[in-house]
Amino acid sequence: MCIRDRSYGNEFTRANNPLECGFKRYCHLEDGIDYIGREALLKIAEDGPERHIMGVTFGGEALSGVAVPLAVIAEDGTVVGEVTSGIWSPRLGCNVGMSMIARGHWDAGTRITIRDSDGKLRDGTVSSLPF
């Protein structure tokens, strides 16, 4: 598994906008071409997206993959996102994943906790992509 490419259905769905997903360069916001949704995207670009796809690294036993989204929890206990794809990285010696994370929590280096599919809490860190 390559934790680099964003996958429709995992990292993003129809519920997300292209700016959350890192696809701003495909939106042609500056060239004046009109299309359905352009005004909404301009507003999101002005205000900033509510969520963003980021990498996460976290400890614990090796994951064989992420079958269901795993909660990303801020230091105050608030769920601020979800890990949508993940696996053990032998090169980094930890679990890595892609996550949709809320504004204010997506800066690389931010300390987080991941709740795995067994309910165990794992210490983690938000990271830039690619790893």
Regions found by a protein language model. Give the residues of each.
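Conserved, structured C-terminal
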Residues: 4-131
